[in-house]
């Protein structure tokens, strides 16, 4: 079977969704800039060789509608001979894009793919136009479509305290801030234009949503937002609302080597799994277990892990049940996570994978895992290997 490898991976800075640096920049532009960036960074690649552009996006309406993958690829000047498709596995959409490209390569259905994802949550809110079928109530808990309440449920089932959640959130901001100051995001962030608070055009170089001043004291002052009477989940322990895009160049290994392109990581295994929609945040556990089994390894073999931080109350049960509580500070979300950086839905899968690959290089690690929960009860996971 042919091998799928990551040749390059980049992301935009994460912009604040409310009056942030990308308030005047459309989702198609965020996407197109990254597509162009991949080609500029890898001049050995003939753009005419691109088989398909596979782009994750959840709210496929307004500027994100009508196949944003194609709109963005045309804006980017990618040859019209390349295909383009937008995929939606909710929060796992751009990781699904990785999987689709990898499967195509493994089965001989192309050797060069641009994949990624985008979500401009400032322009297209996550609940825009949502209209669940009334019949879902027959076998799905009514609150399953409210992600914050599913996090409350998961936290209660696993005995996760308010203090544990607050500490996890503080860690996320502290580590993301340290990664920024120390330049550890520099290799993955592809600077693009945005606007400052006064409306002046600027080159955006850093994430806008990290709050380095976050402390246990400041978080303790926040009220529960989803279950005000009995809850523990606050805005401070939930993923930030942000706008952003991420992208990867995925190729068949021998083709990349023949062109003299770098092999940054090989896709070792992939998996998706379902779980009860009422505890959708638990999805990374069964998905990771599948991916590890397919790779023929155990969780102890992993050197670095990126677990998407939808909520602290959701992340901690996954860490606990995967047997990783004792190695959080050595292996998990070492540059912070979505609580600090935000979770632009369609962007996040390729974003955490990009951060993971850069961390693996920084630490000279061999095996890494990227995994995330998915609304309505799914998980998705990818094992990467440096070669």
Swiss-Prot record:
GO CC annotation: what is one? cytoplasm
Localisation per UniProt entry: Cytoplasm
Reaction(s) the record says it catalyses: an acyl-CoA + acetyl-CoA = a 3-oxoacyl-CoA + CoA
**Record pathway:** Lipid metabolism; fatty acid beta-oxidation
Top-rank taxon: Bacteria
Give the UniProt record's GO annotations in the biological process aspect: fatty acid beta-oxidation; phenylacetate catabolic process
Leader sequence range is none
Q: Where is the active site?
A: 91, 343, 373
Q: What is its main location?
A: cytoplasm
Keyword Lipid metabolism attached: yes
- EC class of the enzyme, as a word: transferase
**GO molecular function terms listed in the Swiss-Prot or TrEMBL record:** acetyl-CoA C-acyltransferase activity
Say yes or no: keyword Transferase present. Answer: yes
CDD domains tied to this protein: thiolase
UniProt keyword terms in alphabetical order: Acyltransferase, Cytoplasm, Fatty acid metabolism, Lipid degradation, Lipid metabolism, Transferase
Q: EC?
A: 2.3.1.16
What HAMAP family does this protein map onto? Answer: FadA (MF_01620)
| Entries under NCBIfam families matching the protein | AcCoA-C-Actrans, fadA, PRK08947.1
| Summary of the function given for this chain in its UniProt record | Catalyzes the final step of fatty acid oxidation in which acetyl-CoA is released and the CoA ester of a fatty acid two carbons shorter is formed.
Q: What's the subunit arrangement here?
A: Heterotetramer of two alpha chains (FadB) and two beta chains (FadA).
The entry's family comment says: Belongs to the thiolase-like superfamily. Thiolase family.
State what protein this is by name: 3-ketoacyl-CoA thiolase
